[in-house]
Amino acid sequence: GTVNFTGSIVNAPCNVIIGDLNQTIQLGQVRTAKFTAVGAKSDPQAFGIKLENCDISGTNPLTKVTIKFDGDPVPGTGAGASELFGVGLATSAAKNVGVEIADYRTNTRIKNGVPSAVFNLAAGETTLRFISSYVSTAAAVLPGTANATAQFSLVYQ
């Protein structure tokens, strides 16, 4: 038999709780009729990434953090396609739609591959909160599976 051990050692003021390292956000089954124009959105789903054991004391403490989400963009040149997270290239994938991640505080889109606005850290625990939804990149959205993946990284300041 085999036992695998995974993890990492980080030089950071906080650590991400294990349950938030890998999440699945259910955006549900959305009718194509919901997307009546370019930029139309599905109902949002909130999610968070909780940081724990935050130590923001000492000399030159790191008290702020940004997050960057990286993933495959929506194929093509539709409105906002490069800013959103693509739902796949398979023939069974939905077309002209992507997943948006927005900052819960301001409802501002966090563009694919671009760091977010700054979040302030609190001693102990801080939860970074977001909203996700499907967004159309063209006037006509075609049905299909709509699963996207985004990797995240944190930069402390």
Annotated model-derived regions:
Residues 1-157:
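Mature extracellular/passenger domains of Gram-negative fimbrial/pilin and adhesin proteins
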